Every structure is written in structure tokens, then in C-alpha cells.
Amino acid sequence: MTQKLAVVLFNLGGPDGPDAVRPFLFNLFRDPAIIGAPALIRYPLAALISTTREKSAKANYAIMGGGSPLLPETEKQARALEAALALAMPGVEAKCFIAMRYWHPLTDETARQVAAFAPDQVVLLPLYPQFSTTTTGSSLKAWKKTYKGSGVQTTVGCYPTEGGLIEAHARMIRESWEKAGSPTNIRLLFSAHGLPEKVILAGDPYQKQVEATAAAVAAHLPPQIEWTVCYQSRVGPLKWIGPSTDDEIRRAGGEDKGVMITPIAFVSEHVETLVELDHEYAELAEEVGAAPYLRVSALGTAPEFIDGLAKAVRDSVGKAPGTVSSACGWRCGADWSKCPCREGASA
């Protein structure tokens, strides 16, 4: 009898049109992983923020045609992963499902689809290489609340230094650099979405894992490429982790250097890459004289990346029910209390 395997791919989600922008923002800011206030405060605050930010957010999405490309990009990854699993796991009927956190297909919708598939095994695979309570943690909590179907469940908690991920990043960076003529007056910026510093101080391993990803990729690059890690998309009054991407662009301009920027935590093109990197930061680079300004694409369906995901799924199958494991053997120290793969953590 053919085993049925459901692979659930988690990501942020994005509005599919102008009318979806405000409800998407409301769903985002009412998440306790994003705003930690009690519900009586959080819900009105989410309504206020989504209303006040709607106009500017719509303008950003208008640059991309009115909506986010994240779902179609993720669907391409799902189909590519299914094809890779068909080769890697003959005799297994593997089907990929997409669960978005803040817009359709929402977690509860996907949970019903997976239950109807009646799988023997369910592998939860967040499309966030680096674990954070604000992304992977939030998605897994929502799944646990909603899924009532069959199947032994295991989770790929993180994969910050997984070989396929690293190889794909390194290849794409090298290709962009060589296409530009292998410039030496350039600094590579590994740009990741930032977080409030208090999230990291509370034991979230995200920053540590982002920096590990960058270091692993840099080890596969020509030694003359100078690099640094920086963080983008800061909002609100809280202190965020740094340095910020815009400050690093200004620093490069002040040193008469160009920048080559690569999204190191985003695996798909969406508003933070197609608008923030391609428009806002490109304009900033021009203003401060950081030339050339090069942007490396997100991983998308890079073969090395997809093969790495397939290996992560294959390795997760057969583990004890409820196991949360790292696809690259990552093990946070005991001080990183929010990491499900930390030393001393139970499955």
C-alpha cells in the first residue's frame, strides 16, 4: 500500500489584491507573536495600525501589480519540491500543501485540506531557514491548534546551514558578482528582516542563525568579496537588532564602495525584496553614492535549495512523533530558551 505523505509549507502570506491589504495587516498585527499585548489591547491596536498603514502599504503593493507574488512563488516551490520528492522517495505519494499565516490559504483552510488527504505522515516545513518565535514559532502554534487529521507529525524546525541552502546562495551571489564584472570596490550585504532587540534577548535564536547562514555562505565565496550582515524593515519605536541595511548602504557610500545585497532570510520574492530592496534601497544607494548597486535574487526554486528541502523532508520521515529537528544538525545552546532544537530540549 502506498504511503501518503503530506508536506506543509509555512510562510507569511500576502494580500492578493488592494482590498486584502488592510485585513492582511490586521491579521499580522493581532498575532501575539508580533505584538505581545493582551488581546483586549492587541485587537484595537491591530485595527488602528492596519488602518493607518493601509495607504502606504497599498502603494507598495501597487508597484507589484496590486498584490503580493508570495503565494504564486510558493506554489512554484511546492511543485518543485513534489517533483524532487517523487525522485527521492519512490513508492510514496508526497503532496505539498501551503499554509500562510496572515492571508489565504490560511492555516485552518490548509489543515482541512491535509486532513481530507488522509496522510500517513505529516512533515511540517517552514520556509524560514532560521527559526524565530515570530515566524516559525507562530506558524507551528497555529497549526497545532487547528489540525485534527491523521498522520504521524514531525517538524523541520530550522536549516540555517543546510548544504543545499548554502550552495544555492553562494552560486547565485557568485553569478551576480561575475555578471557585474567581478568588482572589487563592493561590499556584500546579507540582509535579513530585523526584529526588536527584546525578542532576541528573550532567547530567540534568529539573529544567531542568520549570522551563521551568512558566514557559511561567505566561506564559499571568493575571498576578495567583503561582506557583512544587516537587518531591514524596521517599524515602530522599539530598539531593533542591527546594523540596519540602510545604515550599511550609507556607510558603503561614504567609503566610495558599491553594495551587492542578497536576501539571506527570505526564500521568495515579495514586498520586502521587490519594493524595499529593488526600489527604496536602490534609491538610497544612488543618493549616497553607493555604486554599483547589485541585488541578488531570492532562492525561489534554485535546484540546490529544493534538493536540500527534499532531503530535510526525507530525513524527518520516520522520526518519533512530535519530533522537532534541525535539517543541518543545528543545536542552540541552552541559553537560547525559545529554540526547539536547543541543548536539553525534549522532542
Curated annotation (Swiss-Prot):
PROSITE patterns linked to this entry: FERROCHELATASE
Catalytic activity: heme b + 2 H(+) = protoporphyrin IX + Fe(2+)
CC terms in the record's Gene Ontology section: cytoplasm
Record's keyword terms, sorted: 2Fe-2S, Cytoplasm, Heme biosynthesis, Iron, Iron-sulfur, Lyase, Metal-binding, Porphyrin biosynthesis
Extent of the signal sequence: none
Tree of life domain: Bacteria
Enzyme Commission number, as recorded: 4.98.1.1
Protein name: Ferrochelatase
Taxonomic lineage from the root: Bacteria, Pseudomonadati, Pseudomonadota, Alphaproteobacteria, Caulobacterales
